[in-house]
């Protein structure tokens, strides 16, 4: 009995496993899998359609074709289970074994596996230390290789050509062995003593000094130690036995008309078997060497094609001239096994249809067509019908459902009640692309969708389709209801703002009823309460827009979270009172006492969610929607051609601009301005004109003059339909209105350059032919761009998801002390992102102190919600240290304290949340909104850079930060550092403005001074760079020879003479060696030193410098000794939009990157080479660092200046790798976060910083070993952080030296491929390469990430699956004995079930036998 239970259990359960390992298969292993050798290339008999014996479909090897029936028909039915037929040799069993039984082919000659040969770096090549070309020559029989030199003077592994081999034979006879082909390689591989080689390499590595050699040795050592650790043997990379795939995985399907469709693999296998058999025959016949050799080569090529067709030589083509699909093609690429069948499957119980709007639905409902529902819920209906006794069998139930009788519809209603369905719209760019709803049955064939979830789906009703899925199990329904219901997804996971917000018609309706109008009917009436207003409005006594006075009841939340009610009188518009009727208690009236634009409605809902909770918000959102639709219909707002009012001043403005352009053309003709300047000026003029026309138009459309009650004329906001639509945020924008009624303005060509002649007409007036074609010219490019953008954006999302997919919240607190500092993001005089937005929802890493009383305001580990962020703002604190994903020390995944708030839920993130994927989706989803083009800087932008002063915008106090200054005799300060900032704080002490202060700027205020708005606090000359002295003394010239290194020039206007340093190219041979400079000396002619160091005050003068002082002059601190003219930096293209984001995440090194200072110290210039300048930085302790910089690079530092480590010394885009190396992880994170946000901010997309931080954390997973210490790690090897930590912990226990590491930055593609999990990497990109590397190393995949678990078909270890896996691991940890005891116990019900199943499936006598046994 127990055995019976065990057998039935075992048939049901799949094997439990915790990890997957991939290894090379030895020939013995291949034979052990096999059920027999395939000897013939035949497939099936063309007459009987039965498989040929010993052929590719042989039933004897692979199993029967029909269940429990042998091929010749002698044994049929279940009772013969397990019998092997003596006539045809087929085992009687299930036919599905033909999916799992393998065969094999014994190869007559060994064959190299193409992956280990050709997949770079070639593993066979590395092991033998022979180049790939040479190995190919041996394999394809073009050269001999010496396998055993014996006593001769040949080298082992030396290649011999045919002639050389014959010569050697003559010379040495049989003293040596040389072979060719795979046998030779196999023999060489077999002779390698892996252990000895590893030892030898390790010793050699310690002695060698050359960089290239170390690299080469490390490569070999890696592969060899992989073989050593994994237990793979090198000779297994050469195949002697070829496994044959089970036949049902390479089927042969009869088509109508007697033809067959077959898998390409059968062709490839046939080819191998044919050649193998021919080779066997030739060997038996002792055929001539050259024929055998040719056959062996052909066999090698056939096996290559089977494993990876097209990897070497020409691909083998099928009958229809297309490449045959080999085994490698089966698994790689978009239509390979991984991406097509394992990561994405088609599912049952699903359907799709067009969507239409469902304005009467509640937020949690979706309208499901009856026809669809009937089909989707069929099994549920069948079981209900049988349960009710309306049908006795499934067949009867089916008939009832097909007839669609009334009882079926009643049961359908019952079945779908509270059974959620999932709706999905492709493309599913983020998790809100699939949400759950309760179905409501509707007539017709279209799915009805609630308008408020359109934003999340990015759906509109112009023919979009959506798919419906039915969650079947109870758990699935539970999760759908509690986690995926649309009512539970009110906030956007990317930024934590509401996403269930009204848009378009609803906004227009709400905006319309909350506007007020002068002199409307009922103006000035007074009402006792809101009900009276409603009655008055319904009886036409008061207009929607009339200003009235009403007594309202207002409930406000107090500190304790209770609602306190109070009465007050308000003067407001009647429509706002109608809206107030539906506003839940607890919201202040001020939120609706304004025209309700989209922004205002969003704010209202956000406030409601944060203060009154989810349920109230959802009900309120629905009410808002019904009201908005109602009054939008009522308002009668529509669009007519007369709504587009062209301003009267337009003609005048345009003719003025045309005059200006003519003037500039004249200047250009007379040579006063260059071509580039003319172009930029013209474009500037037209941009300005366009703005002026637009302004005139908006003034005309936005305001209308009306008479008030006294008959006076007053201005009020206009009721123009177009203005109302764009002002409310329902549809359209100022830019679009400008094209309709202003002027269309400048257009771009397809390459992005701007056409100088603008379109002066607008759409109201109509375009002429030329204008029409100008506008279509750039427009077509826009359409082409959109298509490209979608693909690019999708690929970026895929890479992001792949790199972050295994990042899950694994613990509550990792206990780290590390943190990052947050401050407001300020550029110049504008706060781009205030501190509150940056720290909201984070956890404090250090207590926050009150700057005035030094008392603790907030303790460490406080969760910063809205209320606590308000405290920070009240005390104007502008720097806090918070926990961050980058500094989290959780071993796998991340901890909830470091992550902070789950943006989509509003509380601290739960353990098990898949934050990696959420981050990837949040960054990828708005990708399609980003632009694709690179910007050319020109016109206004390029001239704005030449600023020459700092004027503060707000009144406050000055703080000088990191600013090194010297004081001049007149009392002004002069900046002598370049990374300094000037900060303006407001009266509360919050930072409002940040300004960079360039070297040599004169600063007219001191630290702590008060300034007024508009005051100029610093000035400098943007076109020259001054050399400023920091010490007082006497000036001495060095190497300044008149006529050689310098010339005197006299200014004709002023008569003043100045000294100019000549260019090195113009000097005579003797002058080339001279290095012109000035130095400062004291009274005794001894060198003076710069303050705080041993660096003499020498100032090297580059070519073109103007000297303003003469030799021997006395100078004071802060005096300008010389001026170096600055050419304004060339306009270069700025990569923007999507390509910029991709560059940042791929951590690409920019072209001509900025050169950063490697150490802190004083700058001096050494001897130049031919085309490079030499820059030397001397640290305070005397160590120096030299940097050779190409002459054409613009060096932004000067002799004698002090630079900090990581400061820019030659301009250019900064390289993230340099930032990481010199300034550390936090600076890098800050850089990437700000740069990515910059791109999204331009498009008005909000993404929380923490999502970008999560991706950066994944890019920093790996470290480089700088000193291996006593660990087994190799120098310069890239290893996961966690692995180094584990290795070091082991070493610490043994009191050894630990490995030292430095962080490295990997781009997202590299990081995905370098992940610990080979399954995840293989399913991402470069499948062959990943699998080759993994199999050689005998890699083990612990299935930690989400992707690996999806691929092996398990619950993912995130969300609800997280606890499931934890329990599984806990059970796995139990002792083996406990498990066995549990297995032995058979419950009564189990026994009964087992018995009944056994009786069902077998003949009566077997049941008798089972009873006897008992």
UniProtKB/Swiss-Prot annotation:
Binding site for Zn(2+) 2: 814, 888, 895, 898
Start and end residues of each stretch annotated as Disordered: 1392-1414
Reaction equations catalysed: RNA(n) + a ribonucleoside 5'-triphosphate = RNA(n+1) + diphosphate
Segments of skewed composition (Low complexity): 1392-1403
E.C. number(s) listed in UniProt: 2.7.7.6
CDD domains xrefs: RNAP_beta'_C (cd02655), RNAP_beta'_N (cd01609)
Cofactor: Mg(2+); Zn(2+)
Keywords annotated in UniProt: DNA-directed RNA polymerase, Magnesium, Metal-binding, Nucleotidyltransferase, Transcription, Transferase, Zinc
Gene Ontology molecular-function annotations: DNA binding; DNA-directed RNA polymerase activity; magnesium ion binding; zinc ion binding
Positions contributing to Mg(2+) binding: 460, 462, 464
Positions that bind Zn(2+) 1: 70, 72, 85, 88
Entry's Gene Ontology cellular component terms: DNA-directed RNA polymerase complex
Cofactor detail note: Binds 1 Mg(2+) ion per subunit. Binds 2 Zn(2+) ions per subunit.
GO BP term (any one): DNA-templated transcription
UniProt-listed Pfam families: RNA_pol_Rpb1_1, RNA_pol_Rpb1_2, RNA_pol_Rpb1_3, RNA_pol_Rpb1_4, RNA_pol_Rpb1_5
Function per UniProt: DNA-dependent RNA polymerase catalyzes the transcription of DNA into RNA using the four ribonucleoside triphosphates as substrates.
Subunit structure: The RNAP catalytic core consists of 2 alpha, 1 beta, 1 beta' and 1 omega subunit. When a sigma factor is associated with the core the holoenzyme is formed, which can initiate transcription.
Family: Belongs to the RNA polymerase beta' chain family.
Protein's UniProt name: DNA-directed RNA polymerase subunit beta'
């Amino acid at each position: 009995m127990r055995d019976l239970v065990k057998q039935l259990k075992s048939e049901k359960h799949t094997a439990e496993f915790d990890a997957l390992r991939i290894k090379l298969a030895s020939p013995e292993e291949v034979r052990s899998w096999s059920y027999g050798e395939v000897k013939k290339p035949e497939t099936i008999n063309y007459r009987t359609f039965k498989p040929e014996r010993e052929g590719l479909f042989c039933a004897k090897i692979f199993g029967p074709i029909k269940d429990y029936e042998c091929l010749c028909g002698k044994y049929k039915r279940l009772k013969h289970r397990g019998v092997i037929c003596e006539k045809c040799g087929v085992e009687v069993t299930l036919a599905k074994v033909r999916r799992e039984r393998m065969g094999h082919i014994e190869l007559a000659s060994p064959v190299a596996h193409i992956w280990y040969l050709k997949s770079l770096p070639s593993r066979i090549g590395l092991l033998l230390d022979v180049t790939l070309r040479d190995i190919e020559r041996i394999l394809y029989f073009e050269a001999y290789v010496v396998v055993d030199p014996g006593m001769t003077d040949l080298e082992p592994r030396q290649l011999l050509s045919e002639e050389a081999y014959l010569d050697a034979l003559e010379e040495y006879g049989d003293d040596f062995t040389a072979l060719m082909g795979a046998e030779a390689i196999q023999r060489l591989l077999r002779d390698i003593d892996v252990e000895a080689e590893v030892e030898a390499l390790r010793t050699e590595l310690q002695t060698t000094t050359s960089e290239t050699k170390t690299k080469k040795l490390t490569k070999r050592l890696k592969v060899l130690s992989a073989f050593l650790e994994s237990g793979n043997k090198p000779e297994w990379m050469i195949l002697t036995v070829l496994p044959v795939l089970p036949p049902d995985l390479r089927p042969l399907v009869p088509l109508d008309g007697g033809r067959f469709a077959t898998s390409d693999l059968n062709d490839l296998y046939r080819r191998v078997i044919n050649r193998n058999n021919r080779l066997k025959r030739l060997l038996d016949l002792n055929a001539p060497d050259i024929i055998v050799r040719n056959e062996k080569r052909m066999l090698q090529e056939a096996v290559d094609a089977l494993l990876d067709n097209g990897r070497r030589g020409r691909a083998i083509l099928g009958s229809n001239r297309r490449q045959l699909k080999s085994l490698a093609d089966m698994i790689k690429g978009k239509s390979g096994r991984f991406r097509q069948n394992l990561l994405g499957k088609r599912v049952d119980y699903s359907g799709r249809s067009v969507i239409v709007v469902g304005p009467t639905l509640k937020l949690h409902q979706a309208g499901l067509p009856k026809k669809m529902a009937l089909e989707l819920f069929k099994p549920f209906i069948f079981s209900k019908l049988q349960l009710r006794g309306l049908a006795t069998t499934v067949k009867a139930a089916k008939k009832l459902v097909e007839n669609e009788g009334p009882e079926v519809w009643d049961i359908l209603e019952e079945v779908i009640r509270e059974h959620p369905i999932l709706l999905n719209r492709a493309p599913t760019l983020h998790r809100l692309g699939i949400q759950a709803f309760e179905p409501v049955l509707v007539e017709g064939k279209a799915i009805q969708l609630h308008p408020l979830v359109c934003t999340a789906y990015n759906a509109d009703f112009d023919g979009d389709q959506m798919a419906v899925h039915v969650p079947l199990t109870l758990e699935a329904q539970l999760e759908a209801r509690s986690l995926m219901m649309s009512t539970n997804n009110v906030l956007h996971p990317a930024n934590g703002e509401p996403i269930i917000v009204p848009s378009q018609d609803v906004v227009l309706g709400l905006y319309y009823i909350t506007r007020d109008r002068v002199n409307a009917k009922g103006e000035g009436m007074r009402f006792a309460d809101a009900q009276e207003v409603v009655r008055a409005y319904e009886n036409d006594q008061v207009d929607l827009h009339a200003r009235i006075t009403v007594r309202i009841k207002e409930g406000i939340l107090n500190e304790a979270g209770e609602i306190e009610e109070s009465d007050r009188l308000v003067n407001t518009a009647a429509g706002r009172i109608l809206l107030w009727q539906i506003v839940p208690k607890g919201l202040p009236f001020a939120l609706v006492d304004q025209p309700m634009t989209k922004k205002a409605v969003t704010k209202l809902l956000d406030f409601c969610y944060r203060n009154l909770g989810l349920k109230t918000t959802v009900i309120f959102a629905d009410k808002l929607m019904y009201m908005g639709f109602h009054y939008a219909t009522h308002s009668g707002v529509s669009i007519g051609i007369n709504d587009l009012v062209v301003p009267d001043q337009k003609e005048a403005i345009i003719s003025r601009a045309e005059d200006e352009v003519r003037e500039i053309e004249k200047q250009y003709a007379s040579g006063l301005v260059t071509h580039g300047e003319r172009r930029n000026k013209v474009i500037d003029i037209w941009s300005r004109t366009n703005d002026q026309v637009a302004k005139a138009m908006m003034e005309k459309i936005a305001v209308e003059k009306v008479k008030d009650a006294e008959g006076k004329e007053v201005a009020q906001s206009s009721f123009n339909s177009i203005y109302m639509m764009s002002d409310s945020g329902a549809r359209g924008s100022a830019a679009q209105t400008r094209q309709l009624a202003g002027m269309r303005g400048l257009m771009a060509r397809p390459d992005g350059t701007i056409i100088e002649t603008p379109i002066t007409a607008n759409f109201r007036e109509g375009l002429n032919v030329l204008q029409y074609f100008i506008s279509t010219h750039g427009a077509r490019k826009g359409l082409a761009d959109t298509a490209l953008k979608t693909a690019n954006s999708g690929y970026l999302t895929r890479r992001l998801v792949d790199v972050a997919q295994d990042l899950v919240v694994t613990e509550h607190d990792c206990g780290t002390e590390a943190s990052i500092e947050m401050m407001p993001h300020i550029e110049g005089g504008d706060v781009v992102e205030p501190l509150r937005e940056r720290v909201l929802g984070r956890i404090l890493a250090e207590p926050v102190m009150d700057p005035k009383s030094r008392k603790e305001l907030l303790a460490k580990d406080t969760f910063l919600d809205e209320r606590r962020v308000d405290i920070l703002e009240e005390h104007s604190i502008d720097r806090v240290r918070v926990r961050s994903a980058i500094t989290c020390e959780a071993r796998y995944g991340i901890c909830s304290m470091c992550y902070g708030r789950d943006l989509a839920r509003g509380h601290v993130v739960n353990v098990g949340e898949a934050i990696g994927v959420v981050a990837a989706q949040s960054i990828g989803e708005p990708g399609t909104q980003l632009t694709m083009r690179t910007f050319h800087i020109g016109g206004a932008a390029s001239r704005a850079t030449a600023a020459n002063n700092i004027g503060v915008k707000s009144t406050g106090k000055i703080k000088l930060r990191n600013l090194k200054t010297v004081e001049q005799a007149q009392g002004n300060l002069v900046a002598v550092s370049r990374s300094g900032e000037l900060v303006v704080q407001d009266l509360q002490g919050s930072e409002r403005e940040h300004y960079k202060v360039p070297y040599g700027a004169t600063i007219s205020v001191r630290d702590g001074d008060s300034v007024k708005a508009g005051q100029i606090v610093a000035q400098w000359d943007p076109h020259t760079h001054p050399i400023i002295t920091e010490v007082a003394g006497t000036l001495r010239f060095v190497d300044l020879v008149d006529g050689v290194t310098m010339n005197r020039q006299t200014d004709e206007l002023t008569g003043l003479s100045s000294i100019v340093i000549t260019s090195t190219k113009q000097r005579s041979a003797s002058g080339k060696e001279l290095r012109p400079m000035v130095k400062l000396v004291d009274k005794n002619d001894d060198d003076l030193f710069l303050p705080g160091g041993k660096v003499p005050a020498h100032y090297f003068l580059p070519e073109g410098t103007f000297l303003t002082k003469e030799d021997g002059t006395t100078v004071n601190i802060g005096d300008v000794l010389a001026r170096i003219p600055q050419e304004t930096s060339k306009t270069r293209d700025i990569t923007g939009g999507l390509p910029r984001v991709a560059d940042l995440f791929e951590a690409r090194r920019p072209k001509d990157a900025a050169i950063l200072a490697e150490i802190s110290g004083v700058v001096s210039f050494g001897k130049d080479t031919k085309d490079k300048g030499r820059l030397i930085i001397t640290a305070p302790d005397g160590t120096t660092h030299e940097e050779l910089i190409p002459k054409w690079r613009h060096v932004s530092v000067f002799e004698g200046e002090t630079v900090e480590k990581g400061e820019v010394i030659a301009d250019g885009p900064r390289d993230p790798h340099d930032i990481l190396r010199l300034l550390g992880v936090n600076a890098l994170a800050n850089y990437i976060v700000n740069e990515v946000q910059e791109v999204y901010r331009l498009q008005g997309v909000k993404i929380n910083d923490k999502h970008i931080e999560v991706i950066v954390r994944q890019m920093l997973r790996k470290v480089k070993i700088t000193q291996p210490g006593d660990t087994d790690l190799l120098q310069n090897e890239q290893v996961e952080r966690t692995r180094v930590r584990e290795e070091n912990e082991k070493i610490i226990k043994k009191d050894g030296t630990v490995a030292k590491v430095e962080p490295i930055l990997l781009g997202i593609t590299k990081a995905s491929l370098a992940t610990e999990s080979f399954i995840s990497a293989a399913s991402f990109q470069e499948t062959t390469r990943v699998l080759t590397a993994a199999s050689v190393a005998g890699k083990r995949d612990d299935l930690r990430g989400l992707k690996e678990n999806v691929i092996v078909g398990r619950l993912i270890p995130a969300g609800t699956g997280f606890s499931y896996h934890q329990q599984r691991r806990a059970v796995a940890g139990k002792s083996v004995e406990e498990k066995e005891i549990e297995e032995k116990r058979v419950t009564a019900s189990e026994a009964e079930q087992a018995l009944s199943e056994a009786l069902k499936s077998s003949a009566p006598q077997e049941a008798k036998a089972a009873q006897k046994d008992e």
